[in-house]
Design a protein with these regions (language model features):
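Glycine-rich NAD(P)-binding loop of the Rossmann-fold in SDR/ketoreductase-type enzymes
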Residues: 17-32, 65, 69, 73-74
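Conserved Rossmann-fold NAD(P)-dependent oxidoreductase catalytic core, especially the SDR/UDP-sugar
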Residues: 5, 31-70
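Conserved catalytic-core motifs of eukaryotic protein kinase domains, centered on the activation segment
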Residues: 13-20, 54-58, 101-102
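PG/GG-rich flexible active-site loop of Rossmann-like NAD(P)H-dependent oxidoreductases
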Residues: 50, 95, 166
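Active-site beta-alpha turn of Rossmann-fold NAD(P)-dependent dehydrogenases/reductases
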Residues: 7, 44-47, 68, 92-94, ...
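C-terminal substrate-binding subdomain of Rossmann-fold SDR/epimerase-dehydratase oxidoreductases
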Residues: 119-120, 124-238
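NAD(P)-dependent short-chain dehydrogenase/reductase
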Residues: 80-131, 136-145, 174-176
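NAD(P)H-binding glycine-rich loop region in Rossmannoid oxidoreductase-like domains
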Residues: 1-25
Length: 238
């Protein structure tokens, strides 16, 4: 059996709104899952690059983590719980973008594009801040890749994404502006989300995984979808 551990409260806003639930679901439920595994079951854990924090530097899997949110803290705690378990791979995913049936609207590329299309204005906080991104279909492909290469990857942690997909907030906003006209306002106020880092994906790329979809392709897809897609925030119900 292969278990894809996707259960959890995901993202800065959702975890900040209910830290107790984030601890119970992201950390304690992971502990229960680990204790329930048989020796023959393989587990692929969905972790996050968010734990690299606000260093502003290039980060690989050996870089000391600096979690700056409840979300990042709980995901790192889950990683540590699984560290000594047999048959486990942890994937530190980039921020996902692109359309899906239950799309998260709080993710940066999805959110920025929605505001450009629907509101015609985007206010940027800490426009210099860098993040790393990955199309949702590439994220799914990464799970399949890891399943197919499990024996080679087990017992380790991998950044999941691509070296060509590190962008600043301002760069994302301008890529959207290349496709649709809207106003970008740079605010002097600080963002509550302090993340700022550049992620290195050499480790997983050397095994053969490289994301195929570009940011530009994702933006084009979202612009088309937002002509009929009704906004829903997944964490309002938490």
């Amino acid at each position: 059996d292969v278990i894809f551990h996707l259960a959890g409260i995901s993202g800065f806003p959702a975890c900040a709104s209910n830290p107790h639930s984030a601890q119970l679901i992201n950390v304690e439920a992971t502990r229960l899952l680990r204790d329930s595994l048989s020796k023959n079951q393989r587990l692929i854990n969905a972790s996050t690059t968010s734990m690299y924090g606000k260093s502003g530097k290039h980060c690989d899997e050996e870089t000391a983590v600096e979690p700056v949110s409840t979300y990042a803290h709980t995901k790192y705690a889950a990683e540590k719980i699984l560290h000594d378990a047999e048959n486990v791979v942890s994937l530190r995913f980039a921020t996902v973008f692109g359309f899906s049936p239950k799309m998260r609207m709080d993710l940066m590329v999805n959110d920025f594009t929605y505001k450009a299309v629907k509101e015609k204005v985007l206010v940027l906080f800490d426009s210099f801040a860098k993040r790393t991104f990955m199309h949702v279909e590439d994220a799914a492909d990464c799970y399949i890749f890891t399943m197919d290469h499990f024996d080679e990857m087990k017992g380790d942690i991998y950044n999941a994404g691509g070296n060509h997909l590190n962008y600043s907030k301002e760069e994302i906003a301008n890529l959207i502006k290349d496709k649709i006209d809207y106003n970008i306002i740079n605010s002097e106020l600080k963002d509550k989300d302090l993340r700022h880092f550049i992620v290195n994906f050499d480790k997983i790329e050397k095994l053969g995984f490289v994301p195929k979809r570009t940011i530009q392709e994702g933006i084009n897809e979202l612009i088309k979808v937002y002509s009929f897609y009704e906004y829903f925030s997944h964490y309002k119900t938490i």
